[in-house]
Every structure is written in C-alpha cells, then in structure tokens.
Amino acid sequence: METKVGKQKKRSVDSNDDVSKERRPKRAAACRNFKEKPLRISDKSETVEAKKEQNVVEEIVAIQLTSSLESNDDPRPNRRLTDFVLHNSDGVPQPVEMLELGDIFLEGVVLPLGDDKNEEKGVRFQSFGRVENWNISGYEDGSPGIWISTALADYDCRKPASKYKKIYDYFFEKACACVEVFKSLSKNPDTSLDELLAAVARSMSGSKIFSSGGAIQEFVISQGEFIYNQLAGLDETAKNHETCFVENSVLVSLRDHESSKIHKALSNVALRIDESQLVKSDHLVDGAEAEDVRYAKLIQEEEYRISMERSRNKRSSTTSASNKFYIKINEHEIANDYPLPSYYKNTKEETDELLLFEPGYEVDTRDLPCRTLHNWALYNSDSRMISLEVLPMRPCAEIDVTVFGSGVVAEDDGSGFCLDDSESSTSTQSNVHDGMNIFLSQIKEWMIEFGAEMIFVTLRTDMAWYRLGKPSKQYAPWFETVMKTVRVAISIFNMLMRESRVAKLSYANVIKRLCGLEENDKAYISSKLLDVERYVVVHGQIILQLFEEYPDKDIKRCPFVTGLASKMQDIHHTKWIIKRKKKILQKGKNLNPRAGLAHVVTRMKPMQATTTRLVNRIWGEFYSIYSPEVPSEAIHEVEEEEIEEDEEEDENEEDDIEEEAVEVQKSHTPKKSRGNSEDMEIKWNGEILGETSDGEPLYGRALVGGETVAVGSAVILEVDDPDETPAIYFVEFMFESSDQCKMLHGKLLQRGSETVIGTAANERELFLTNECLTVHLKDIKGTVSLDIRSRPWGHQYRKENLVVDKLDRARAEERKANGLPTEYYCKSLYSPERGGFFSLPRNDIGLGSGFCSSCKIKEEEEERSKTKLNISKTGVFSNGIEYYNGDFVYVLPNYITKDGLKKGTSRRTTLKCGRNVGLKAFVVCQLLDVIVLEESRKASNASFQVKLTRFYRPEDISEEKAYASDIQELYYSHDTYILPPEALQGKCEVRKKNDMPLCREYPILDHIFFCEVFYDSSTGYLKQFPANMKLKFSTIKDETLLREKKGKGVETGTSSGILMKPDEVPKEMRLATLDIFAGCGGLSHGLEKAGVSNTKWAIEYEEPAGHAFKQNHPEATVFVDNCNVILRAIMEKCGDVDDCVSTVEAAELVAKLDENQKSTLPLPGQADFISGGPPCQGFSGMNRFSDGSWSKVQCEMILAFLSFADYFRPKYFLLENVKKFVTYNKGRTFQLTMASLLEIGYQVRFGILEAGTYGVSQPRKRVIIWAASPEEVLPEWPEPMHVFDNPGSKISLPRGLHYDTVRNTKFGAPFRSITVRDTIGDLPLVENGESKINKEYRTTPVSWFQKKIRGNMSVLTDHICKGLNELNLIRCKKIPKRPGADWRDLPDENVTLSNGLVEKLRPLALSKTAKNHNEWKGLYGRLDWQGNLPISITDPQPMGKVGMCFHPEQDRIITVRECARSQGFPDSYEFSGTTKHKHRQIGNAVPPPLAFALGRKLKEALYLKSSLQHQS
C-alpha cells in the first residue's frame, strides 16, 4: 500500500462525467464545456513572472499553468495547494467534514507538486470546485497528509490561509491521531487502550493545541469513531495487511468508549485509499441516519474545537500574567520548614555598603559590579533572621518586604554551591576569607543559576550584585531549606530527563514520585502526598525559576511546570508587578538597622581615580560629548558582542587560511582628487630653487586663485567620493612639468577621526602619512592653516606646556565662535602599516628639493616584494632578503614532502583543537645552488629554482627524541630538494656545538642552531659525521663570543675582570623602572632578565601579590597600597596638588602614610620607564561602566595609570592588557588611551601578541601599547619564535584596513611549540590536595625547557594542588588517561559515596545541555602530553571556564608550580599566601618570556638611538 504524500495514485476523470452540470459558487464564472471550448492561453499568460502570482478563474487553466513538473505516466493531475480556504457557496469558511452535508468549494494558490522549493510558479484562483472528497495519506511514513479532490485534479494541502488556519489545524490534529494510532497498532496490535492512549499522547506532545498529555488523551477518545472509520477503510484497500483494524479489540474499544465530559465525534466517514480506485465519502454515509443528526454532530464538534481554543487562550493569558506579576511567598506558609525565630548578632565592626560604591546615579542593573559575599546572613529591620524566599526572584516594583544582609565582601571569585557536597558549602573556598565585613542596603531581588553541578545564588541591592559563598554558621539553617528546594528541583529534572517524553509526567505524577524517594536522598521531603505537595507549592518560586533557566525547551514547558504554576495561582497571594525597565536610581541612604552602629573606613571602595588635569580633561570632554543615553537593549547587545570576543576562553578564535601571515593590510593608494573646472589664475611666486631628478624646475611658492601656496604648507583637495570630506595634503615640493603644467607633490594629512583613535581624536590635530600624490595646482580648492608643532619634552616642561596648550585651546574656541576657519596642527606621523604614531621626520619633510620619503618607501617596498636573481645569478632576492649559496635558510614545511617537489598549499591540516598537534617548525636547509630554467635564461626576469639540502630536527625523528633533545639541535642529511624561491622564509645560522653562545638563555630569540650528527633518512639512523663529509658552518660574527672562545670564557673585557653574560648590562646602566599594578612581578622579571630594566619601585594593591613581588625583587621598594593614594602622595610631595584631581578619601589616606613611606616615593625625573597592566574589571563581561557614564569611568584605573605617565613623563611607557581591551566599550577606552598618550606628547605603537609564540605552553593573547618620548626610538615588535595555533591578533583600523602585529606562526616558525611534557614531565608525582610546599625533584630534567626553567634549583617549591571532592575525584580517576579525554568519556553509571548517597558518575546536566554548549568540550578534561596547557586562570577547576585541568597521567588538578611553568616562571620564582592566592598571582601575571621578548626589543631601540647619536 503506497501512502506516501505526493506519490499516491489518484483516480482519473471519467470522460462521461458531465462536469458542466456541477454546481458552481456564486463568485465563480463557469466554463460549461471544456471539451467543446478549446483552451487558449495568450503568450503573455504562458510565463508566470517571478514572485508574482497569476490570478485565474478556471481550474483547468490553473492546472495547465502549473504542469511543468507533471509526470507523463500519471493519468490524473496532482498539485500542491497553499494559502487555501474551504468555503460554502456564500464564501463562509467551513470544516472539511462539512462536505457530507453540502457543497464545498476551494480557493488558494496552486503549485506544481514536485517543485517544493520553487514558489514562483504559483497560480491563484478565487474559487472553483466543488470538492468531491478528501482523504488522509502518509500512514506508512508516519507523517499525515491531507488530500482534497475535485472532478479535475487531486490537491495536496500544504498551508492554509491565515483565516482558515484554526479550522484546518483542528482537522489536521485528527489526521495526526489517526496516523499515530495506526503506527501504534501496527507495532503492537494487542496493546491495551491505556497504553495506546499514552503512546499517542507522547507522539503528539509537541502540538500547541493541547496543554498536556491528558488533554491529548481526551481528544483521542473524543475522536474514537472517526479514527476507527479511517483505519477500517484501510482494510478494504489493503487486504494483505497483517493487521485487521475492523476487528481490532482496542480500536473497537476506542470507538465505543464514552466520555462523560466530551461528546463523541460523529463523523463515520470511512475513506478508502487505493491506487486504482477511490471511494467518495458520501458513498459511505449511512442512509438511515437523518441529515439533521449528522449536522448536529458536526456543530457539536465545532463547539468542542472552539472550547479548546478558549482553553488555549486562557493558558496563554495565564502565561502572560506570569510574565507581568510575581506571586509573593508568605512567610507564615514556609515557617514550618525553617528554624525558630532568631536574631542576627555580630560583634565585628561592619562597613556601610554605600561606602564601597558611589550612590546617587541611575544605572542599569546589568551594569552593577559583582562581588562575592562570604559568611553572610539575612535579616529584617528588627534584625530577625529571614529567608531569601520572601524576596522576589525577579525585579519588582514597590515590594512590601524589607530584607537586609551582612557578610564579608571580596572580589568575585566564582563561588558556587556544589550539588555533590552534602554540607551545602562551596567547593572553591577556604575557611578564611579575605575581604571586609559590611552590611548591605535593602536587598531587591535574588536569583539562582544552575550550572552543571554547581548552583550559583546571587542577590542584588541597588549598589551591586553579590554572589553568595558559604553562609555564616548562625544563618546556615535558614539557607539549608533553599538548598533543599534546589535539590528537589534537580531531582525533578532527573525524573523528566529519564523519560522518553517529558509530557508523560504530569504534575500529579511528579508529586507521587517525590513521595517515593528514599529518606537518605538529598531531595527527600516526606512520604505523605499532601506534605510533599504543600512543600513543592509553597517553595514553588525557586523551582519555577530553575525550570525557566533550564536550556531544554521541552522541560521548560512540561505539564509539571504548567500544573505547578496553576497551583500557585490558586493560592491567591499578593502579586508584585514585575519591572520591565532595568534602570534603577541608586539611593544614598542605607536603612539597615546596623547603620546606626560605628563602622570602619574601607580600602575596598572603587575609589575615583586620581588623575592629572590633562588626563581628566581629555576623558571628561570626550564623555561630555559621546555619552548619549543608550537603550538597555542596545547595551545588552554590546555586552554580548564583547563577551563573544573574549579570547581568554577560546583557543581557536578564527581560521586563518593564508599560507603566509601578512603583517598588515597595506594601503598606499592615495585619495583620488577631483579636478577643478573653474578658470583661475595660477603662477609661480619666486625663483627656481632647483630641479627634480627628471630635470623639471622646482619652485617654493605659487599663487593659486589669489592664495599663496608654499612648500611646507597645507592645501585642500576635493575627492571623487562626494560623501567623503575634502582631503588635506602637506606640500612637499612644487614643479613645472615638461608639458608646462604647474604641479604639486604632497602627502596626505589624515584627520584623527580617520585613524585608529577615531572620535577620541582632537578635531584640530592632523597626522602626516606616507600616502602621497602629484596633482595639478589648478585642482587645489584652498589652503588651510597648519602648524608643525613642537613642544619641549620632559617633566620639567609639563606646566609650561599646559599653559601654552590652554591658551591655544582658548584661541581655537574663540575662532570657532566667530566662525573663522580652523587652525590645524601636526606633530606626529601615522603609519597604519607599522601600527603606530611616530615623531615627524622633520629633516625629510617640506624641503622642496624634489625628494619624497614616501615615494622612497614605496619604491623600497616594491623592490622587496620582488623575487629575482642577483646580477651574477648566484644568489636570490626574496621578500627583501638576499640569499647566497651556502646560506642556511628556513623553508615552509608544507613544501617539503616525501615525494619530492610539491608546491605548498594554504589548506590547513586537521589539528586537535587548540593543541598545536600537527604544526611544524620551519625546515632548516642549506642553499646549494640556484637553478635557472633553460627556457628563460635569456629573459630579463628569468625563472629559477633553488637547490637545498635538508637538516632534520629531533621532532622529525620521534616524539621521544624531541622531548629529550635540545630544541636548537639539527641533524645533517643528504636529502636534497629543488623548490621555488617562494618557499624560503629567512636565514639562520648553523654552528658546531662548541661554537654556540656560552650563555644560552630562555626564551630563545636568536636564529642559531647547532649540528654534530648525521641522519640517514633511508635507514632512520643517526650517525657521526662521515670522515669525508665537509659541512661549512656559519661564521661566528659575535666579537664577544670570539673573545670568550679565545679566552676560554674567563674574561669578557670588563675592567674589573668579572665574568659577565654577553647581554647582561649593569643595573646602573638600565632604565629605572616603576611597575604599577605589579602583581607578583612577571612583567618586571622578564624585563629585568632582558637586561634593560631595573625595577626600583612597584605598586600593588593585593597584599599577597605585593609580598611575592618583594620576595623576588628584594631591592625594589614595594608599595602595597592603592595607586590613587600613591599618585596623590607624590604630587603632594612635589607641591602639585593644584594639578591633582582626587577624592577627599585619597587625601585622607595620604595623610596617614608615615614619613618613611613618603621618603621612598619615586619622583618625576627618577623613573625612566613606567610599565604595568591596569586591572581588567572594567574590561570583563560583568562591569559597571558599559553605559559610558563619565561618573563611572572616573573609577577606571586606566586613568590613574595614564596620569602617572603624564606626571612623570618617563622615556618609555608600557601598557599590557587582555585582548578585549581593544574592543571594550565600543573601542572607546582603547582610543582614549591612545589619544591621551599622543596629547601628552608620546610616540605610540599598538599591537596584540600571543605569548605562546615566545616559548610558553599556553595560549595567552595580550594587547601591548608602547609609548616613547619624541626623542627616543619606539621599540619594534619581537619576532614570534615558536609555532602556535592561536590566531586572532588583528586590530581593525578605519578605511577597511587591519593591522597584524606579527606574522602568524601556524604555518611555520623557527622552533616547535613547547608541549605539556616539555613543561611538566619531570615533576614528581603528587596526590590530590597535596599541600607540602618543599619537595625533592627526584629526577633529572629531560627536556630543554625543563633544564632552563629549573636553573640551579635543588628544592622544588609550590608543587601543591587544590583538593577535589569525593565525587569529582572518582570522576577524575575514571577519565581515561589519553589525549583529549573529558567528561564525555565517563561511563554512564552510578557511584555510591562514603556517606551512602548514590550519585550519577556522568553529569546529567552536561549530557542534556551539551548540544547548546559545544559539547562542553574540555570539562573534566585531561591534558595532552603533546599539546599545550590551557589558559592560566586564577582558579583552575574541572567545572570552571577552563575545565581541562587534570594531569595527563595523575588523578588530580594541575599544581601551582605546573601553572607557573606554563606561564614561563622559573622554578626559583616564589609565590605568597594560600594556594588560592598563588593561583591568582600566576593567573593574573604577564608571562615572563613575553616580557623578556619585549625587553630585548626595548634594548635594541636604546642601542639604535645611541648608534644614531654617535653617527650624528
């Protein structure tokens, strides 16, 4: 029996039928005889216009126009029908079954049957028919189809018109019920009626018409006779069918079943579906049954349909009401579940919450700061303990309950309540909490977030959100009820998830199952049904909120939720109106009963930043202009965008498909100017100054339309694009061409708004660029006033410059008010190709000599981009590098293949996500010869290839060999390759081992290798060099090394005769450095190791981190204090209080500093270098500044950091931060930072670097901003040395450009990546929760990295780790010890804990939500020995943001020392405080190898300046 929709054969039209006699609807124009009246379709009508329906009157016309996909062997037309209505002769919509009692007609859109995707061929008809019969198909497929037949064709009903939808949908559900009963009885004819109804209800549970499975069952019973007749009709058309529906006892029982509430449907139409014959429905009507009875039955069914619709609307209104109102929980109803009344007592002094925050502003609740509250308690205005439940779980207006709280506030540490912990304690806390005792203002709402196996409870005041840690012992009994209710909700989740259909469990079913829980179950309430139901209803708001947050839609809308909401509605409690607006006004008074008690001043308040007036003005003026009110929805969207950009959680942000990483998207194409059609007088004004290189006369001045244009001035040129502002160009020189045209050559002066600083730029400042062009003087539209500005540099000139700038701004404002032209100034060169702003090349601009430095740069770039032979054809130029025979070179690895010559491809190999497995370093080769192809020898641009011999690396042999070998070791071979010159990627050195630098340090920044072994690739064996083989090694060019070799390393030429490392510089010759936001000192350590910095002062707010800094930098003066206070103290000491913008609190704290502290403060002129990374609180996903309010931005520490730079005016300034710093707050913070440094007078360079490419085994992108005084040289970016797969370092620039700081190393780098085994493979075994600080190594270091990171250490410190709770430890042991294993590899089984509780080994919550969260990859994950460690965070845990934290072979979380090594800290580096403090110090640190690489480039810049000065 073929019943598939669209393939069922239909009956053909009998040629003897007199279709001309059929009844027609009143609106239709009848065509009486199709046979006698030929159909003529005009040429215009033959083609249906795309997306435009044709309207026709005759059915036959519609059939002909939609015949494009008609099957020739189908005797009867089949069509699709959409947007249709079945109506009577008066045009009134009618149910399909009404066909039994009268004539039914059709209107709609007819389409070809087989062309589902093509809706352009539809033909609309107003009305035709009549409808002869209808039938249901799709029984075998399980997908019902409704077919309607007229005398001419059969129509597959797809989509009804909107006005007909409700009527048709009801009939379609009847068809669905028929198909589901057919499916169930075909599988099991002997099933019971209850089982049949349950099966059908499960299958139809997705329907929006029914509220629950019970409603579906009632509907199926009401349609019993209808269903019986349809299936009985199948017996007649499918006689060989194994199931006999007519005599099936269950189907007969369904037909005869009487419902006390709903009258049976009375349609006894049986349809026969046959390939050869269809029986009309009216043939099956029992003639004995009176027509009025049949009509009454149909009317009754229509009333039933309408009643169902009303019920559905009522449910919808109930749901809508639940979104408008919050049902208040009365305290007396839940009193039995709580302890007897008790009062809050605390002898400790508590600080008013309002002192930590600044009240009085309208803020969005989503922008409030988030803190953690430990050791907390809640109470009312009488200090009586009170439950959280009396508070709303949604923001409500005018709540009539007052709840306050107290506790120890600390920075948000992600605390939560572990569901596996029987004591309702957090899994991430110690008993001692750092923070301060406070009392809260009125609590307005609270929420529960359900995250896998952690519960996060958060409450909100008007000042902040507080994530709750462990409650106080006094309050713990009041909180236990809340946690128990959470466990009840989670138990219900588990019940529902175990069902194949969640609709199977009604509210009553769930209550019964809760009664059956064992007494030792954490969700056990009672065995009595009434007690359980009372508990669930009175605590229903907690349960409903958890269901609302659950990601599974079916569970969210399950019958249990509907039933519980209905029960809560029936209680008739007070309803609070839910607030739609998220904005709140922070009040300035705290009504907490503890407000009358004495309190202390807090150090934790986010103090308004202490700033200089210059920085305050720049940021304040910007926010006075660009702080429009942003709708809360828009703010939310911005936040979501920024969260998605957070590279800290994603190791594979984008797929770069370029084979060669491009440093920057260059653009030297100048703006095209538009010629001037006006006639104006143009003549030279002055004598000839000289000639161009082409012999054309040069002039210094010209008169253009009465205006004087001079070399060194600025002119306006209109551009082709009318939407762009006119371009301003700096005049380099003017000349008269050979065809007597007066010409000008100039460089583009870019407006600040068109640079990376955007709207933060000063509208009067222009930036010189390297974009130049030559135009006719007649194209000039005018001149502008331009001042090539120069200011004396240094802290001693700061006040003088401020006065001059103030007068300049006043003059500009006056000119603007009087409508006078803008006077521009220029003091910097903007180079997007180099990612920065540089001092003007004053010696090369405005000379009028015919020379243009920009043209020279373009010529050099074009020359570098060429690949060509040298003149003697014995060498190669490629990418600006000249290669000669005998040179050691880098080759892209995808050019070296087993089958010889094969051009590289940009297609990326399949890699394990984020682990660098599969990435290869450059292949080191020696250039043997340049082969010029024979056919191109005579051509000027001859084609050529290079012949190379290959060196193998240890990793080419095996993983074990790579692990145990020096990363700079190579093996010579006889393998040769002939490759295109594009494969070459640079030069390196290969030396004998005893010619290597004596002091090789980590990280490696030199391209030097050594070779002393031969590798036979044919046998795979390593051998000593054959006696007859002569390998020409690199020549040693390092004079220091030559002296060392000659003197055997005893002396290096110093007068003292003390042995000194080649790169070591005495501290007195280094830059005196002030490290702000110093942390434990990772940045300072790397810079000092590079030999460029001497950290004399450090400022760190957190005491444990400050102590760690002091331990590792004992000579530095460390201020463990707020940097705002320190800056205020310095400015007071120097007598510059008038220039200091700070709070009264900062001044009071300065007064409390002792004289010893004040005497050690750094002063302007003493610090050559300021470095640091401002806290990221403002740049994280949860911040209080995203609304752009200036009053809130003033608390950003970035302002204080920039003010240090302004006040001290050091030679160099370095800012480090997370990648998101560039995009935070729509990029405004980044732009204002750049604008501030430029306004101070600095040269500025910006970029993003990946620490993993500098020798650490973890991905860690950092934004770096360098600033150098106008007299210094800006450091270049360090070259990435290790392959690492973590792209995403591009910074977007205006005009469609982007800046790539350094090349991407995914396709090759000088060295391989550092692996997990390299990093931690030598560390001894430790157990879960290890706390012993000092240990023995027990083994010798194996890898090159281990040898460097250990140094001379004999005692291993801080190889300690956090402890896993019992369940997580069991899970850890069950995670397979193989690469990439995580929670998905856990067996699906239960485990019994020591307390007797039975828990699921595989977290159910993860299993059910995996599809929406990238499979929760990495949670409970094991590290891969050959991969990299995850991003170092402040609190590693298996359910954290970086869940891959299990050791590759041991059953524990990675230790403090292992995390430190992943950041590149040497084993000698000490950390301070608890295990948690140490993880925090490491997670917040700058990787020392990255700092070392930056320091080396800074040292090069200093040497370059010294060299330039020596030359001059």
From Swiss-Prot:
Signal peptide per UniProt: none
Active site: C1176
GO MF term (any one): DNA (cytosine-5-)-methyltransferase activity
Expression sites by tissue: Expressed at low levels in vegetative and floral organs.
Any one GO cellular component localisation term in the record: nucleus
Predominant location: nucleus
Keywords, in A-Z order: Chromatin regulator, DNA-binding, Methyltransferase, Nucleus, Repeat, S-adenosyl-L-methionine, Transferase
GO BP annotations, alphabetical order: DNA methylation-dependent constitutive heterochromatin formation; methylation
Superkingdom of the source species: Eukaryota
Feature: compositional bias, Basic and acidic residues: 1-22
Ranges annotated as biased composition (Acidic residues): 638-662
Matches recorded under Gene3D superfamilies: 2.30.30.490, DNA Methylase, subunit A, domain 2, Vaccinia Virus protein VP39
Record keyword Ribonucleoprotein present: no
Domain called SAM-dependent MTase C5-type: residue spans: 1071-1505
Region (Disordered) location: 1-35, 634-678
Pfam families: BAH (PF01426), DNA_methylase (PF00145), DNMT1-RFD (PF12047)
Residue ranges of every copy of the BAH domain listed in the record: 707-841, 909-1026
EC number: 2.1.1.37
Function, as annotated: Maintains chromatin CpG methylation that plays a role in genomic imprinting, regulation of embryogenesis and seed viability. Required for proper patterns of CG DNA methylation in dividing cells.
Name under which the protein is recorded: DNA (cytosine-5)-methyltransferase 2
Chain's gene name: MET2
